């Protein structure tokens, strides 16, 4: 018999993460590497594990992630979003817990585009009075 799997897609900035939850002992594999090899910051790794700790499922699932686009922070946010969605598929009773923590909401903040006549999105060229 095929083993049970739960899927979730997470997005943040320009990163997209395809997350698969498989019953296991709590390992997190990102792009066929351990999470500590892929994401350098311990704070970001804790951020990724947040949905699992909130729902007390940290040791019950192995998390297999395929993520692309963006940087470390965006990828961490996308993975977290994907894990939350996959947990919801595994057990719909987690909805209130995850929703209250804001883990099911897609963070819509994006980089603001650069405008012509300016040095950045809002930074104006230096003003000279004389």
Curated annotation (Swiss-Prot):
Protein species of origin: Bacillus licheniformis (strain ATCC 14580 / DSM 13 / JCM 2505 / CCUG 7422 / NBRC 12200 / NCIMB 9375 / NCTC 10341 / NRRL NRS-1264 / Gibson 46)
Family assignment from sequence similarity: Belongs to the universal ribosomal protein uS9 family.
Entry annotated with the keyword Hydrolase: no
Any single biological process term in GO: translation
NCBIfam families: PRK00132.1
This protein's GO CC annotations: cytosolic small ribosomal subunit
Lineage: Bacteria, Bacillati, Bacillota, Bacilli, Bacillales
Keyword Membrane: no
Gene Ontology MF: a single term: RNA binding
Protein name as it appears in the record: Small ribosomal subunit protein uS9
Keywords: Ribonucleoprotein, Ribosomal protein
């Amino acid at each position: 018999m095929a083993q049970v799997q739960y899927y979730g897609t997470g997005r943040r900035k320009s990163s997209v993460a395809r997350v698969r939850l498989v019953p296991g002992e709590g390992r997190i594999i990102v792009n066929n590497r351990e999470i500590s090899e892929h994401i350098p910051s311990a704070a970001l790794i804790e951020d990724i594990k947040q949905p699992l700790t909130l729902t007390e499922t940290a040791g019950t699932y192995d998390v297999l992630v395929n993520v692309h686009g963006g940087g470390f922070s965006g990828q961490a946010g996308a993975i977290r979003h994907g894990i939350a969605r996959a947990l919801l598929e595994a057990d719909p009773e987690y909805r209130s817990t995850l929703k209250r923590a804001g883990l099911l909401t897609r963070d819509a903040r994006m980089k603001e585009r650069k405008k012509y006549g300016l040095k950045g999105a809002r930074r104006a060229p230096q003003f000279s009075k004389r």
